[in-house]
Curated annotation (Swiss-Prot):
<protein>
    <recommendedName>
        <fullName>Recombination protein RecR</fullName>
    </recommendedName>
</protein>
<dbReference type="Pfam" id="PF02132">
    <property type="entry name" value="RecR_ZnF"/>
</dbReference>
<dbReference type="GO" id="GO:0008270">
    <property type="term" value="F:zinc ion binding"/>
</dbReference>
<dbReference type="InterPro" id="IPR015967">
    <property type="entry name" value="Rcmb_RecR_Znf"/>
</dbReference>
<dbReference type="InterPro" id="IPR000093">
    <property type="entry name" value="DNA_Rcmb_RecR"/>
</dbReference>
<keyword id="KW-0862">Zinc</keyword>
<dbReference type="Pfam" id="PF21176">
    <property type="entry name" value="RecR_HhH"/>
</dbReference>
<dbReference type="GO" id="GO:0006281">
    <property type="term" value="P:DNA repair"/>
</dbReference>
<keyword id="KW-0479">Metal-binding</keyword>
<keyword id="KW-0863">Zinc-finger</keyword>
<dbReference type="Pfam" id="PF13662">
    <property type="entry name" value="Toprim_4"/>
</dbReference>
<keyword id="KW-0233">DNA recombination</keyword>
<keyword id="KW-0234">DNA repair</keyword>
<comment type="similarity">
    <text>Belongs to the RecR family.</text>
</comment>
<dbReference type="GO" id="GO:0006310">
    <property type="term" value="P:DNA recombination"/>
</dbReference>
<dbReference type="InterPro" id="IPR006171">
    <property type="entry name" value="TOPRIM_dom"/>
</dbReference>
<dbReference type="InterPro" id="IPR034137">
    <property type="entry name" value="TOPRIM_RecR"/>
</dbReference>
């Protein structure tokens, strides 16, 4: 049975909220009614924060992490080891690794992983900019910290092949993260140890 709404404005709000990932129509209705119970100032601040996020957030021109300026705070920090680059799928992985407090290098955010089933190929990722960073000569080690899935392993292999002609060490995080797990869901201790105990990448790494 279709839900009937006493107001078209309420229905519109529910429709928009229900378009968010993981939010069903019942949850969307509950959120919309919650907003109605709050004062107008709260709702205005909430909406303004979302608009500012979409309009004003920038992407670091070096690593593609999100930031408020042209370069993110990690890349701009002279105390970080800029010769050590950790390659991750998305921004959530940067946040997860930073929370471990075990990594003092910098990052490179690919924006996804190779997934033919989803129509995502190497050209859809920020692999070329990673190659350019390595070609500049400052990078001494690349840590591949992608999800331990078939897609993650495929992406690792592609990057390894792209960087094979450069004088750079390529390592992969230890398999403390279970096969099929995504980096962002690993606990901080396990993830931190996986980075510390990383091993050199080779053609059999994805099968280990």
């Amino acid at each position: 049975m279709n839900q009937r709404y006493p107001s078209a404005l309420l229905e519109n709000a529910v429709n928009e909220l229900a378009s968010l990932p993981g939010v069903g129509r019942k949850t969307a209705l509950r959120l919309a009614l919650y907003m109605l119970r709050r004062d107008v100032g709260y709702t205005e601040n909430f909406a303004a924060a979302l608009v500012a996020l979409r309009r004003d957030v920038k992407y670091c021109k070096v690593c593609h992490n999100i930031c408020d300026d042209e370069v993110c705070s990690i890349c701009a920090n002279p105390s970080r080891d800029h010769s050590l680059v950790c390659v991750v799928e998305n921004i959530k992985e940067v946040m997860a690794i930073e929370n471990t407090g075990q990594f003092r290098g910098v990052y490179h955010v690919l924006g996804g992983i190779i997934s033919p089933m989803d129509g995502i190929g190497p050209g859809d990722l920020r692999i070329d900019s990673l190659v350019r960073r390595v070609a500049e000569g400052e990078v001494k080690e690349i840590i591949l910290a992608l999800s331990t899935t078939m897609e993650g392993d495929t992406t690792n292999f592609f990057i390894y092949r792209k960087l094979s002609g450069y004088d750079v060490r390529i390592s992969v995080i230890a398999r403390g993260v279970s096969i099929g797990d995504e980096i962002e869901y690993a606990d901080e201790i396990t993830l931190g140890r996986s980075i510390i105990n990383r091993t050199e990448f080779n053609l059999t790494s994805s099968n280990s």
